[in-house]
Amino acid sequence: MIIRIDTDAATVHVQDGSGSRAIPFSDPEAFTVVSKAWLRVGWDVKDVYRFTWLGRPVIQLPEDLVRLQEAVFATKPDAIVETGVAHGGSLVFFASLCELAGHGVVVGVDIEIRPHNRAAIEAHPLFPRITLIEGDSTAAETFERVRDAVGRAERVFVFLDSNHTKQHVLQELRLYGSLVSAGSYLVAADSIMSDVVGAPRTQPDWDVNNPGAAVEEFLAEEDRFVREEPPRLFDESHVEGSVSYWPGGWLRRIR
């Protein structure tokens, strides 16, 4: 696809297999086309590697963080489980939402929590709401520790952001989906992988070996979940869909 943006005429010109067309800026399709290109360019220049949340690096798109906040506010979980810790920014993000609500704990799981990251997380003022568990998120013994940390929480929200291979994410979906309460969400991050094949820091098999492919297989075998983004709590826009690193990654448990 070839895209040309004419700011004087306020149009986006698109040339693809179906021909050429000019889309006015006022058409939601123009926003969709430009957003997809922006996501790809952002990947190439590592746009998400420049944000922090309350002092800790958080490698997420700002829009994705806002949508997570909306979902947590709406579902009011007693416990939030995140696989993939890295610098701990997302853990602190979730813990800050719990702190504002005056309710909830956060459990972070990673196969390796580097000492400097652990020290920074443990020194953070929100650490009392966080439990760190080091181990393979798909190992039975690790999952048991997570389940113990969640305890008797009635409302549980799960965010999967560790190893992004299809098989690993599928195993996580099967395991951690059992923790999610009815009405809450199971989120598989980084399904954008299939859209950035050929970009820097990618692998040739990402078109099939990615979290989105795991979600498809999981939904085919599991009828307690549906693919469904949280409802917009406020939306006076003409925008269709989301500008996200995990399109199609929101799963709501319906029973």
Segment roles from a protein language model:
Residues 10, 51-255:
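S-adenosylmethionine/decaboxylated-SAM
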Residues 1-35:
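N-terminal auxiliary segments of SAM/dcSAM-dependent transferases
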Residues 32-60:
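Class I SAM-dependent transferase core
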Residues 1, 38, 44-45, 165, ...:
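Intrinsically disordered, low-complexity segments enriched in polar/charged residues with Gly/Pro
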Residues 16-19, 23, 43, 154-157, ...:
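Membrane-proximal envelope and lipid/glycan-remodeling enzymes
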